[in-house]
């Protein structure tokens, strides 16, 4: 059965400040945002990060692994029992 994401009547943007790339802190902030929006991942879920930064590991822009860890763990925290897969598309 295909379930589509519920689109809110009034779109909402949540912006949070995070001082460091701490996966635990990122997890908390993202989980709180998901809760505020009433979103619960289910089925096969794809995330496509657009947050990038340059650093010593790669001189060009890339998405930090600590950020992705926090986001994926927050999605797992909020997931329904029907969540089968979380995929990352870059």
Annotate each language-model stretch with its function:
Residues 1-90:
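N-terminal and secondary-structure boundary signal
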């Amino acid at each position: 059965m295909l379930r589509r994401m519920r689109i809110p009547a009034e779109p909402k943007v949540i912006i949070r400040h995070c001082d460091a790339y701490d996966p635990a802190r990122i997890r908390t902030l993202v989980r709180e945002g998901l809760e505020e929006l009433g979103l619960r991942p289910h089925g096969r879920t794809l995330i496509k990060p657009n947050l990038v930064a340059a650093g010593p590991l790669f001189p060009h822009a890339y998405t930090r692994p600590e950020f992705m860890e926090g986001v994926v763990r927050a999605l797992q925290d909020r997931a329904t029992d029907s969540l089968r897969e979380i995929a990352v598309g870059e």
